[in-house]
């Protein structure tokens, strides 16, 4: 018998804590975030939630990684070319991290749900401070807080929890449109598809929640 998906509201306790840390660090200046999204519409929707969370933590956004305090690549594992681009672009940030040690560089998305890739990132790119999988977006404030306060690298992935988290703030990229995921994951483990690995089993929002 299939387990009924549990629906929870995300824990927002760490949002004001991150805002306080960044206010102290920036001495009143607004912290900036640079988000780069690879892949499908699901990744775009995930990035909109990441931006919503960062906005509530006091961040504004920039198109220039050189100006950012927080850099995040939301990765795609469908095509090898996309993976190669991620490795190349992350490698290019090494000099920037050396110049500005306070920058926090992070990777999320489908690639990070593959153990061999997460291990490669951890070993080959020591300047990357945070790696998290697709099922950890709701924990971003806590992860960010731990990285900023403790200064330790974090890798969190492989979460098979089927809980759906509601009330995650969203910042839309467009004025008149936005992506609305109504379900996540898949129960059909096709050999060519990464979705069941990245997003686990099929689960969906309640109909009234979507409306």
Task: Give the label of every model feature segment.
Residues 1-203, 208:
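Proteins enriched for Cys/Gly/acidic motifs involved in redox and nucleic-acid/cofactor modification
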């Amino acid at each position: 018998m299939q387990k009924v998906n549990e629906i929870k509201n995300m824990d927002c306790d760490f949002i004001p804590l991150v805002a306080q840390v960044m206010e102290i660090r920036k001495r009143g200046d607004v912290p900036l975030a640079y988000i780069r999204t690879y892949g499908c519409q699901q990744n775009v929707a995930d990035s909109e939630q990441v931006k919503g969370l960062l906005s509530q933590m006091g961040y504004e956004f920039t198109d220039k990684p050189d100006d950012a305090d927080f850099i995040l690549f939301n990765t795609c594992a469908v095509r090898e070319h996309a993976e190669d681009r991620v490795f190349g672009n992350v490698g290019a940030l090494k000099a920037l991290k050396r110049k500005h040690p306070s920058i926090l560089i992070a990777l999320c998305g489908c690639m990070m749900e593959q153990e061999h890739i997460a291990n490669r990132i951890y070993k080959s790119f020591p300047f990357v401070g945070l790696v998290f999988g697709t099922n950890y977006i709701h924990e971003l404030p806590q992860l960010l807080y731990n990285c900023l306060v403790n200064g330790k690298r974090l890798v969190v992935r492989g979460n098979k929890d089927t809980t759906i988290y509601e009330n995650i703030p969203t910042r839309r990229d467009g004025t008149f449109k936005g992506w609305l995921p109504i379900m996540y994951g898949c129960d059909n483990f096709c050999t060519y598809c990464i979705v069941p690995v990245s997003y686990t089993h099929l689960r969906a929002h309640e109909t009234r929640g979507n409306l």
